[in-house]
């Protein structure tokens, strides 16, 4: 007798439907009003390797390096409170105004140059590229003074939220190990702040937590965290606020090959080599590492000092500056020259030359000029748009003075007669709390452009470039006066007509 039985294969149910993320072009209307905004000359001066501190542990000279991220937090004026030439082109009862970034140009001053770094006590044992036939044994301290140049990086990222970086940090192992065991690794995501170190060629990692000897890398990163932009995470952001677009150029080659001194934590398996005799009985250090180099610096491969136009962003946010702010992240190691300064310890220079009569200093300078082109846009506030914006970021509606109305209170309220009496509690109303900045705990280079907007695009270099590429013409300011016709009659008398008698 045949019997029916269900199939043994698994049944897959369809996924639960989720709300769809739409592009800002579907609910943001563009206008024909454009503005130029530019910063003043932005300068930074400091020590390229570390912050110089005084006796009270207060920083007297900050750390300013060409290998640092420069994260500019650009503040924009509120377009709903902006003095517009025509205030009737939108309805404030049903619409709100926002800025859209159309163009950006990062101006870089200072000449091209290569900055070097190093360590006076670097963990360098042997030259493994051109090493001796018989490697010498390790001593108690084999550290040497070594300097190098770093990987070459040019980077520019634009978004309305801070960029996200990644690095490898020290993780928590499942079991407690013994002293000297290799630490567990964990991929860490964090916000890239102004002053964070870039990847120099030694990896994106927390050197302070993963290198206890403080001698495996140069002194400017041996106690720092080198971060690398997490392009995968920012590209997969559903709203695309952290990364409208980015420009990147990286290059590196290996200059020298060394190995590390110390006890080898991982032994070479016996099946990978044939044991030797004599001086080759004991293997040399097999922890090899290179010294990176960024190679030649040339003006032919520069990403800066030229305009870039945003026609279509890579995410759903097509350049809309939510929160009236823009985050511009810049890295440029092609201008990382470290200037050497010398000061005499004596009032007059004496002869013969004596090294102790002079003090040597290092300083690095950074120079920026930021220019933007912004377009004024309108958002029509219907039920669907407001619900979508609230699910995306509720603070946007709060900044637009939209909020939930509190329910009516039915409880009995207490009212005192003598409000200034010392016998009762203080009746002064509590001051309203200021809106907290969710990014106050991070460090950014603040650039305020609230009073630097101008509609005269032809008065600025980037504005003229925008008018040229957009096929627009500036309004003429000088016009030739029109000649008016003379109201006086001609001086010559009219001829009388002859009449027959």
Swiss-Prot record:
Domain of life: Viruses
MF (Gene Ontology): structural molecule activity
CC terms in the record's Gene Ontology section: host cell nucleus; T=7 icosahedral viral capsid
Comp. bias (Low complexity): 483-492
Keyword Repeat: no
Keyword Ribosomal protein: no
Subcellular location as annotated: Virion; Host nucleus
UniProt keyword terms in alphabetical order: Capsid protein, Disulfide bond, Host nucleus, Host-virus interaction, Late protein, T=7 icosahedral capsid protein, Viral attachment to host cell, Viral penetration into host cytoplasm, Virion, Virus endocytosis by host, Virus entry into host cell
Main location, first listed in the record: virion
InterPro entries: Capsid_L1_Papillomavir (IPR002210), Capsid_L1_sf_Papillomavir (IPR036973), dsDNA_vir_gr_I_capsid (IPR011222)
Region (Disordered): 473-501
GO biological process: endocytosis involved in viral entry into host cell; virion attachment to host cell
Family classification: Belongs to the papillomaviridae L1 protein family.
The protein's assembly and partners: Self-assembles into homopentamers. The capsid has an icosahedral symmetry and consists of 72 capsomers, with each capsomer being a pentamer of L1. Interacts with the minor capsid protein L2; this interaction is necessary for viral genome encapsidation. Interacts with protein E2; this interaction enhances E2-dependent replication and transcription activation.
Function: Forms an icosahedral capsid with a T=7 symmetry and a 50 nm diameter. The capsid is composed of 72 pentamers linked to each other by disulfide bonds and associated with L2 proteins. Binds to heparan sulfate proteoglycans on cell surface of basal layer keratinocytes to provide initial virion attachment. This binding mediates a conformational change in the virus capsid that facilitates efficient infection. The virion enters the host cell via endocytosis. During virus trafficking, L1 protein dissociates from the viral DNA and the genomic DNA is released to the host nucleus.
Protein name: Major capsid protein L1
Organism name: Macaca mulata papillomavirus 1 (Rhpv 1)
């Amino acid at each position: 007798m045949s019997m029916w039985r269900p199939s043994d294969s698994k049944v897959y149910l369809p996924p639960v439907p989720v709300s769809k993320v739409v592009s800002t072009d579907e609910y943001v209307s563009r206008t024909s009003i454009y503005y130029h905004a530019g910063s003043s000359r932005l300068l930074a001066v400091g020590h390229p390797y570390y912050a110089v501190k005084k006796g009270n542990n207060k920083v007297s000279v900050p750390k300013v390096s060409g290998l640092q991220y420069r994260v500019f937090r650009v503040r924009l004026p509120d377009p709903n409170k902006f003095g517009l030439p025509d205030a009737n082109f939108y309805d404030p009862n049903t619409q709100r105004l926002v800025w859209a970034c159309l163009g950006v140009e990062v101006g870089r001053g200072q000449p091209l140059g290569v900055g070097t770094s190093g360590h006076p006590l670097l963990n360098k044992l042997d030259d493994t590229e051109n090493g001796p036939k018989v490697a010498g044994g390790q001593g108690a301290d084999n550290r040497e003074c070594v300097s190098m140049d770093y990987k070459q990086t040019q980077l520019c990222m634009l978004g309305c939220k801070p960029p996200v970086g990644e690095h490898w940090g020290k993780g928590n192992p499942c079991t407690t190990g013994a002293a000297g065991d290799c630490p567990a690794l964990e991929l860490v995501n964090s916000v890239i702040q102004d002053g964070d170190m870039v990847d120099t060629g030694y990896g994106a990692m927390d050197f302070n937590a993963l290198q206890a000897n403080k001698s495996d890398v140069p002194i400017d990163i041996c106690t720092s965290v080198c971060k690398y932009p997490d392009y995968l995470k920012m590209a997969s952001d559903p709203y695309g606020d952290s990364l409208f677009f980015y420009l990147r150029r990286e290059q590196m080659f290996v200059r020298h090959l060394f190995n590390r001194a110390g006890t080898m934590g991982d032994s070479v398996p016996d099946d990978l080599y044939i044991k030797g005799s004599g001086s080759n009985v004991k293997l040399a250090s097999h922890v090899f590492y290179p010294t990176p180099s960024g190679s030649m610096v040339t003006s032919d491969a520069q990403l800066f000092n030229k305009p870039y136009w945003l026609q279509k962003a890579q995410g759903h946010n097509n350049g809309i500056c939510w929160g009236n702010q823009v985050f511009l992240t810049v890295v440029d190691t092609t201008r990382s020259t470290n200037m050497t300064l010398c000061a005499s310890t004596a009032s007059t220079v004496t002869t013969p030359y004596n090294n102790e009569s002079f003090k040597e200093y290092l300083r690095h300078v950074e120079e920026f000029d930021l220019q933007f082109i912004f377009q004024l846009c309108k958002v029509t506030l219907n039920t669907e748009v407001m619900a979508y914006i609230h699910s995306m970021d509720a603070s946007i509606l709060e900044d637009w003075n939209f909020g939930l109305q509190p329910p009516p209170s039915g409880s009995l309220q207490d009212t005192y007669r003598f409000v200034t009496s010392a016998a009762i509690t203080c009746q002064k109303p509590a001051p309203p709390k200021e809106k907290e900045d969710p990014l106050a705990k991070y460090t950014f280079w603040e650039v305020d452009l609230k009073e630097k907007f101008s509609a005269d695009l032809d008065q600025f270099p980037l504005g003229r470039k925008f008018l040229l590429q957009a096929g627009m013409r500036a309004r003429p300011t000088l016009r030739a006066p029109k000649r008016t016709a003379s109201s006086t009659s001609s001086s010559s008398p009219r001829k009388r007509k002859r009449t027959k008698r």
